[in-house]
Amino acid sequence: MKYGIVLFPSKCIQDFANSYRKRYDSHYALIPPHITLKYPFEANEGQLKEMTKELHRIAAETPPIPIKVTKFSSFYPTSNIIYLKVEQNDVLKHLHEQLHSGLFAGKPEFAFVPHITIGRDLPGAEYADVYSQVKLQHVHFEETIDRFHLLYQLENGSWTVYDTFVVGGKETV
């Protein structure tokens, strides 16, 4: 089964992202707006128990995660993905590193660029038009996230939460 690890921003940021995603993101119906910490990976039931134990340990050692969303950006020319840029910080960077070492060892497929995708799979002309409009908009959100999530992929391609890990040693509410 496929799993992934993400942060979900507040409803305010999700609503803002979804106002674009519903028009420009082919994955709009498959997963809410999120910040990917670990891209999809395969695991079996036995590995899953060990992983959740390790994720609880990582969460207990991780402070609340400050998030600052500052602008629209793009991965062009690598891909036509348009996203909300999330500023890198020490907490995010350390959490990402922990999710790619030890039990989760493995070189990440991509360099860690924290972001919330708002557009993907756009044809060249549409991508250029949309990006030229959004890149001029002022964007500023700041918040602190107190949990990350282990997701799994359903047969229809959508993602759902398998477990939630509250950071800072708090219990899941």
Curated annotation (Swiss-Prot):
Protein name per UniProt: Putative phosphoesterase GTNG_0743
EC number: 3.1.-.-
NCBIfam families: PRK13679.1
Enzyme class at the top of the EC tree: hydrolase
Taxon lineage: Bacteria, Bacillati, Bacillota, Bacilli, Bacillales
Motif (HXTX 1): 34-37
Motif (HXTX 2): 115-118
InterPro entries with a match to the protein in the record: 2H_phosphoesterase_YjcG-like, Cyclic_Pdiesterase, YjcG
Family annotation (HAMAP family): 2H_phosphoesterase_YjcG
Domain of life: Bacteria
GO terms of molecular function: hydrolase activity, acting on ester bonds
